[in-house]
Each structure stands twice: as structure tokens, then as C-alpha cells.
């Protein structure tokens, strides 16, 4: 662990206590409200966590942080919680054969002597502690392009230079453009894609994103492409607009997952978007089969256990998808833009999000929010139908089969397939059983549930 040697205020030592992973400082004088004071903490040691000191896949020594969710405290004195956002600087002295990457803009890079180099990075945009970034290794660095006057960079191991430069050049700029147009301005001074041994997938560290070293293979495959899209989405959601508590982590991970899907819809077509929704729905149902009690919002903290899982990511994304369908695509977009603008570089709660979105629709959102975020149940529907030739009607009965006794209010889309035609109808369900009668001149060939993939539910169709 780390040993604190001294704490200074105005170059004079002050008394302190370092115990139970917390640093308590005796203030040397009284400070008024909103006063700014600077303390210097001098400490040393080998971090127990949070800063990975080890080899790259090529056997070279390296130093990379792994802060998520609350491990920054193991190597930096910080308020290690999402609600505390601060600007940051890293001034690093390292052996001269290393390159150093961090948040923000490069202020200085100077040779100190034959063996050492000083590198100074400074970020002027406030961020939460898990988003601080430090990577020290041998790198090949490419200045790929610019976006709105801000550099796009690639940092990869020199052994992977050609592969990494190829992998990261696309779709980075296109993704930045899409999110800027859909949501609002990119908050940071640069965007660097960085190969790292400290993550398996990606980590959205602000302005300088880590990607698992083994994702770099020179094939620009779908796996890496989707991680790039997801981590760049975090620069808007999670980074610029940051959850106030761990319990609101879906505002980061659910949003990044869904906005990955929105970019896929934009860039690769509706079929890819729908496929991603279906895969997400399968993961949600599988998770629910293993744990039927997990609520997206449930007073959890990083100190007590994991704050994210498939419900945070995939169900969070589905909540946004259903909200977009409920509000209408353009109205949803207007609400998202207003939400981002209001909480740009600030902290936010689920209450804040729904209060902002409610301004853009007359339909009350309280029931929607409550059933999808504050309840663990997954909608389980049995759709039974028969054709009554005497009345020329299709009789449809929709039963909610949840065993807990909690029932959703939701629109269920049904496609009625006839021999020469088909049509989609929307049926509003509530309570255990809902029944409907639909005019039809002849018996349908089939009825299909949720043909447009708009509802998070498990479906069973029965013909009576």
C-alpha cells in the first residue's frame, strides 16, 4: 500500500491521520464557504490496487491505471466517488524510453537527464476520479485527424504499430460526429485511443480511452469496433454527464450501451440495431433466470459490491429504447439534447433525467420509470388468440405470467398476418389479463408478437 510521509499547507507541514484507507487532515485555520485551499500530500509505496505495474503482452514493463469503480484511492489521494468532479494534471518523471499518456492536453515533455524524462498533461474539464488516466509504456503514436479542432490520436505498442493504426482509424471520427449531432458538443480537449494491458474490453477514461491489448489485431473486427463506439459514447454519458451515485450507474452504462445501438442503426442499418436489441433482450432474460430480484435502482454502493451487470447495461439500454418508442424518435432526441445541455460537465440523478424528459411529452412517465427501473420483474406474456367467424373478429387474450403479482402497463404490438396482407396493431395491457376483439374479414394465417422489437418481454403465442 501507500505510506503518507507528510501533508503541507502553504509549504508548512500540518497534522494528519492516515487510517482505514482514509486521510484526515487537521485544518490549520478556518475556511469560509466555497473557499479554495491547496494541500500537498507526499506519499510513496506500491499501490495495492488501482495502478497496474506489470508487463504488456510483449513482455515489456508498463504502468497503467485501473480505477473503476472506486480504486483510484489506492494510488491517488482523492474523493473516490462519482459526485466529486475535478480538473486534473499529471506531471510524471519516468525513464526516458517511455511515453506517458494522460487526460487533456500535453503541456510539456522535457528530457531531464540521460535517463529521465518529464511529461506534463493537464485537463481543464472536471471529471470524476475513476476517469483519471495514466499510461506509461513504450508507444507508437499516430495523430490521426482532427474533430472540431481537437486531435484524434492512437497510442499502441510499437510491436503493434501497423495493426493498431489500422484498427483505430475507423470509425472514431464518424462516431464523434454522430454523438455531437445527436446529443451535443464533445467535452474534452482530445480523443486518444490507447492499447492497454489493464482492461479486457474498454475503459472510458476521459479524453484518453483504454482498450484491451488483445483487441488490437489489425482486422478492425466487429468486437473492437463496437467497443470503440461504446467507449466514445461514454465521453457524453458517464464522463461529461456523470451519475451522482452508484445507484444511478445505468445513466452511464445503460446510456452508452443504447447510444452504441443508435450509432449502429445510423451507420450499419436498422437490421443491425434490431439484432443488438434482440441479443440484449436474451441477456436480460438469462440474467433474470439466475437472479429475479435485481433492480436497476436499489441503493447499492461500490463499497458493498458490484454496481453494474447485464441489467445496468442491457436493461438500461432497453429502458431508453422503450422510452424513445413511447415519446417518438424526434421528441426523444430533443429531450436528450436538453438533458445533456443542462447537466453538461455536472452530476445527475435518475430523477433529473426523467424530470427533463417529462418536459417533452404529455404522457406521464412515472409509471414507466417505476416498473422498469425500480422493480426487478421481466414482463412474461402469453398471447392466446382465436377467430370467431360468426362475428368476424379475432379475439386476443394477453396474460401476464409473472409469479410475483406485479403487473406492467405497456403497449404490446401484434402483427396480424393474412394471406395477402398484414397489419400491426398496438394493444395497451394492464393487470393480469387483458382481452381484445379485432375486426377481421377472415381468419388470419398467424399472429406475431412484437414484430418491431419494441417491448422488453418474453412472449408465448397460442392458437385456441
Locate predicted features.
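A surface-exposed beta-strand-loop module
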Residues: 2-59, 115, 432-443
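Amphipathic alpha-helical substructures
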Residues: 267, 309-396
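Catalytic Zn2+-binding segment of zinc metalloproteases
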Residues: 232-247, 262
